[in-house]
């Protein structure tokens, strides 16, 4: 494994941290990949990459996501340092979510995936039909 420098926790700053091997079963990178490759995480991060948003605005924009799933995903992304949550003591309380600098580093890759999927969806559908037809 390659070593890098851990800089996300101030008390651990400068501590050598193994880069990881996503192909290894016990590598924590897999859990992170599961989270950032999740459809809800991708959509949330891309929206927050455009602008800060409140919970209900995210829920309205991401059709099909349940309140529970949105809440769980935001908590996970916040824990990973990809999203930040700001609470303002108003009546009612105002909670705003923003992407962090760490999360911003994902935007280009995530947008490329979305662009690829939207561009190649007809090809994928054609391949699926051909596969299904071949199976009978």
What residue spans do the PLM features occupy?
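Generic detection of well-ordered alpha-helical segments
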Residues: 34, 38, 42, 50, ...
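Basic amphipathic alpha-helical segments that dock to polyanions
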Residues: 70, 74-77
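Amphipathic alpha-helical dimerization/coiled-coil segments
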Residues: 2-14, 23-24, 108-136
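Low-complexity intrinsically disordered segments
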Residues: 2-4, 70, 97
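Basic, amphipathic "hinge/linker" alpha-helix immediately C-terminal to the N-terminal HTH DNA-binding motif
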Residues: 89-113
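N-terminal helix-turn-helix DNA-binding core of bacterial DNA-binding proteins
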Residues: 19-69, 90, 96
């Amino acid at each position: 494994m390659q070593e890098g420098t851990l800089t996300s926790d101030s008390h651990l700053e400068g501590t050598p941290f193994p880069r990881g091997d996503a192909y290894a079963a016990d590598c924590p990178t897999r859990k992170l990949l599961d989270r950032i490759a999740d459809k809800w995480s991708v959509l949330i991060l891309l929206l927050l990459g455009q602008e800060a948003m409140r919970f209900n605005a995210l829920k309205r924009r991401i059709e099909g996501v349940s309140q529970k799933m949105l809440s769980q995903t935001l908590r996970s992304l916040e824990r990973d340092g990809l999203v930040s949550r700001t609470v303002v003591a108003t009546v009612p309380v105002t909670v705003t979510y923003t992407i962090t600098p760490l999360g911003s580093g994902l935007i280009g890759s995530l947008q490329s995936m979305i662009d690829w999927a939207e561009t190649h969806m007809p090809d994928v559908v054609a391949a699926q039909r051909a596969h299904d037809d071949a199976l009978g």
